[in-house]
Amino acid sequence: YDLLGTEEGVQRAFAKLDTIKDHVVWWEAGAQPPQLLADGEVSMTITWNGRIFNAIAQEKQPFGLVWDGQIYDLDLFVIPKGSKNKEAALDFIRFSTDTKRLADQASWIPYGPLRNSSIPLIGTFHSDPSIKMIDHMPTTEVALKNALQNDFEFWADNGEELNERFNAWLAN
């Protein structure tokens, strides 16, 4: 983000995009990337891991995941100051972030649990016990080795301008 936050960095990014523009298939809906792969229209894609997992586990597509260089986000819980329902909100947060509950959730969809303590408890896919869900989690130590955390502050400060510039580039 340090380099992308400079004009030189933005110019370098767009210069790189210029070199691949004619070879990129842009998608707009999450169902598109697995279909583009299945149809042979693309040889690789960026997408949500749950979509690719579904194609692998339920549609038996011969896809794989590469976590190296993944970009990940964080989700947060917030209780507004002065909330009349503070105790209920705290109860919900305790319930929804329970270590075992998060591990159980991972048997349905491979979205990494927010507690590291859940990772050793992750089992198999709810409808196919031969599928070890840990192999599909983005939050294992191996998967996170070269990951980049999305910088919310950077995008709050620069997102609008970069999106406008990207859309103008895309239109040309």
PLM regions with names:
Residues 50-53, 70-72, 84, 100:
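Solvent-exposed loop/turn segments at secondary-structure junctions
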Residues 7-11, 28-31, 83-87, 99, ...:
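Soluble non-cytosolic domains of exported or imported proteins
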Residues 14-18, 34, 38, 46, ...:
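Non-transmembrane alpha-helical segments in soluble domains
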Residues 20-24, 41, 56-59, 96-100, ...:
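Sec/Tat-exported extracytoplasmic proteins
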